[in-house]
Amino acid sequence: MANGWTGNILRVNLTTGNITLEDSSKFKSFVGGMGFGYKIMYDEVPPGTKPFDEANKLVFATGPLTGSGAPCSSRVNITSLSTFTKGNLVVDAHMGGFFAAQMKFAGYDVIIIEGKAKSPVWLKIKDDKVSLEKADFLWGKGTRATTEEICRLTSPETCVAAIGQAGENLVPLSGMLNSRNHSGGAGTGAIMGSKNLKAIAVEGTKGVNIADRQEMKRLNDYMMTELIGANNNHVVPSTPQSWAEYSDPKSRWTARKGLFWGAAEGGPIETGEIPPGNQNTVGFRTYKSVFDLGPAAEKYTVKMSGCHSCPIRCMTQMNIPRVKEFGVPSTGGNTCVANFVHTTIFPNGPKDFEDKDDGRVIGNLVGLNLFDDYGLWCNYGQLHRDFTYCYSKGVFKRVLPAEEYAEIRWDQLEAGDVNFIKDFYYRLAHRVGELSHLADGSYAIAERWNLGEEYWGYAKNKLWSPFGYPVHHANEASAQVGSIVNCMFNRDCMTHTHINFIGSGLPLKLQREVAKELFGSEDAYDETKNYTPINDAKIKYAKWSLLRVCLHNAVTLCNWVWPMTVSPLKSRNYRGDLALEAKFFKAITGEEMTQEKLDLAAERIFTLHRAYTVKLMQTKDMRNEHDLICSWVFDKDPQIPVFTEGTDKMDRDDMHASLTMFYKEMGWDPQLGCPTRETLQRLGLEDIAADLAAHNLLPA
């Protein structure tokens, strides 16, 4: 595996201190990333293992495209057991930044962390030199101080993935941070903390071997000039512009005349009109601080930044001097929910300081700096929605001890005072009092505080599954398509394949034409909140969405941008290129590849996930024990009939039929929703079939 892959697995046993090297080629049929992670976990972590057991593992895995220079390819897939959902099933975190590329440059496809150190350690990797170092002096520090200390000891070029106090204290909703603001959540911080592993620091100098450099350059140019859009691959601007046939105010292609990076070094820089075709200006298209926080963020925005080899630059960078008053750095930034979630807990909104809406901007920068430094994770905003529910419904008053309730400054909360966020996050990260259990996750607090059906069925709380995870582009995103997608994983689905297509900004007529070309019928694609009953084309759409996210998490590519379903070019009739992943794969690895072969590999990975979930749950009946949906999805908008304009609620019978059709499409048992022996064998998973059969977990 000389091109693309490194061929190496680094196994680190924290209990014994042994560090060994293994051959990754044995897992080649699983491609990399998510596929490697699932196969290793399936083989090595048996049912009954708990997240904080020494027997649990943490698998960091890259793919053949990682670090290659292919656009948007610096992702590492982190696989372990969930700390925060019912059953502690297998989950993934997906971390951007620079860690994945440095892993590859150092010579590793995979890092397996197993066992538990007797005292705090950090893992030091410099190419072939790997060692465990004492971390007592780092324990108790936040992610940023930890990163700075390790870089002083190693090199400014070292990429550090570190946990903060939340991970040390085994807070289930915790993660790790690399490159200051690129996070891997899903409880992985607590897994590291349970193993006394403070950080992994990696610096590589080897690079990634490319089979055909000329073709690689041609594909990069092709993608950058003809296919790529903005964040989430939105391909039209958010405002009417001289070059654009279409615009959509919801588009993340927000660059326009008169919109500036207001705090840029050397003076404001105008984003301007950015027509497609010029590779050098792609990074101006997306302006997430204004998109996420509103116009008040413009004057504080220094620039947009992002991950290694990503031209989109969706990570906003701001500088607000007055946030130092709250004991945090004046600079910081993030993207998406992490940018704006922190002030959502204020029932009356955040208090402004000088300008209209600056309280939201300032409060969120304070919040995200604290949150990231502690290494907390918001579960796609569910932590903050749970806080709002428990406060507004009187749960805190009922379950918190009187002394604890009295000492919390609820008056600051009502006033929108940012100091409340400081105290709130400190309590969560340091496990102070009963309130801190909020960061145990939704399932845990529902059990602990006896929240009942009112909690699970509350539409504003957005809990998708009674396993304790929220919606992530679900029924509001192509109805049955998003609903099926949200049922399939063991956390929020982290799938953007379908929502990127929906949100592309192109008019409905064009989107339906593309849907017909891809899925056989225009009826695969409905207008938002004007949905129709399930049909075969929608099932194909759902399968494609799931297989593409598995593919992206395996090769690895960023599913916030990929696939190239549509294009910003009128000359292409706005059509994208779904074979582009395969073209890059061939150029990088030198192996013949088609999109059909990659889709088959993705199906193998997805089915392995399903099989491992069956094994961990010790049940074949996935329909009735796993693929469950909270009641609000069906009961919202009681005054509007289902399948009429104005609602995105689902119909119970239709969803039952949808799952049956999807199971058949996947080759799973149509009633139980578990993989069959025939399908496992078709996908080259004979060993999995034999193992499930031995445990009576195959359908008759």
UniProtKB/Swiss-Prot annotation:
A Pfam family it matches: AFOR_C
Classification via SUPFAM superfamilies: Aldehyde ferredoxin oxidoreductase, C-terminal domains, Aldehyde ferredoxin oxidoreductase, N-terminal domain
Keywords: 4Fe-4S, Iron, Iron-sulfur, Metal-binding, Oxidoreductase
Induction: Up-regulated by the oxygen-responsive transcription factor FNR under anaerobic conditions. Repressed in the presence of nitrate or nitrite via the two-component systems NarXL and NarPQ, respectively.
TM annotation in the entry: none
Enzyme Commission code: 1.-.-.-
Cofactor(s) needed for function: [4Fe-4S] cluster; Mo-molybdopterin; tungstopterin
Cofactor note: Binds 1 [4Fe-4S] cluster per subunit.
UniProt: [4Fe-4S] cluster binding residues: 307, 310, 314, 558
Enzyme class name: oxidoreductase
MF GO annotations: 4 iron, 4 sulfur cluster binding; electron transfer activity; iron-sulfur cluster binding; metal ion binding; molybdopterin cofactor binding; oxidoreductase activity, acting on the aldehyde or oxo group of donors, iron-sulfur protein as acceptor
Family: Belongs to the AOR/FOR family.
Name recorded for this polypeptide: Uncharacterized oxidoreductase YdhV
